[in-house]
């Protein structure tokens, strides 16, 4: 597991955007696992700049999002469908829509939708890169504490802490969905390479637990210790004291 403090959200996001760009440039049929939320905004902004500058052919790139709120239509401003369109797919409108995969949070039968999305993941095979954030309680995707390590795509009852943390995106806390559909922990670990981003002081405790705690369902992110190719990029605020700071221009 590689852990680096790149100083700022902007610097870390730029570095990871370059990693995604290189993957798409050198592997035109690559499969990318994508994440959403406030952590990822600079990442997509930087990636869009790189794509637009170089007019990269992404017609054969496939994307797979981690999760979606249950009960929100794709057109809802707080849905992750809307987020991805707003942050990436409309900003660089050359991705093939048939290769964009995001769980449907407004399906009639959500358990059937979870099964269908899991089938898609299994049929498409390993993602080349999986992008992750981390919740303040150590969740990855929407896999809350207590989620079995062998879980696949499923419906999640969100914890009070997650609902409260996400309430800043809604008019009031009562508007935050109480459930989500999420890739399971087993799905996440199927990726060839995992890149986790964490920014801000509120994420420091979760990162400290991830790095120092034994693998436990109480902190789902600790399962990443079982994966052979994990990279964690932090800013100063999220970084535990024992992780040295490095500048992007010092990296290979």
From Swiss-Prot:
CDD domains: GlcN6P_deaminase. The active site is at residues 67, 137, 139, 144. It is an enzyme of class 3 (hydrolase). One of its GO terms (molecular function) is identical protein binding. SUPFAM superfamilies: NagB/RpiA/CoA transferase-like. It catalyses: alpha-D-glucosamine 6-phosphate + H2O = beta-D-fructose 6-phosphate + NH4(+). The keyword Hydrolase applies. It comes from the Bacteria. The keyword Ribosomal protein does not apply. It holds the Pfam family Glucosamine_iso. One of its GO terms (cellular component) is cytoplasm. Keywords: Carbohydrate metabolism, Hydrolase. GO terms for biological process: carbohydrate metabolic process; glucosamine catabolic process; N-acetylglucosamine catabolic process; N-acetylneuraminate catabolic process. Pathway: Amino-sugar metabolism; N-acetylneuraminate degradation; D-fructose 6-phosphate from N-acetylneuraminate: step 5/5. Its EC number is 3.5.99.6. Catalyzes the reversible isomerization-deamination of glucosamine 6-phosphate (GlcN6P) to form fructose 6-phosphate (Fru6P) and ammonium ion. Belongs to the glucosamine/galactosamine-6-phosphate isomerase family. NagB subfamily. PANTHER family: GLUCOSAMINE-6-PHOSPHATE ISOMERASE. This is Glucosamine-6-phosphate deaminase. It comes from Staphylococcus aureus (strain MRSA252).
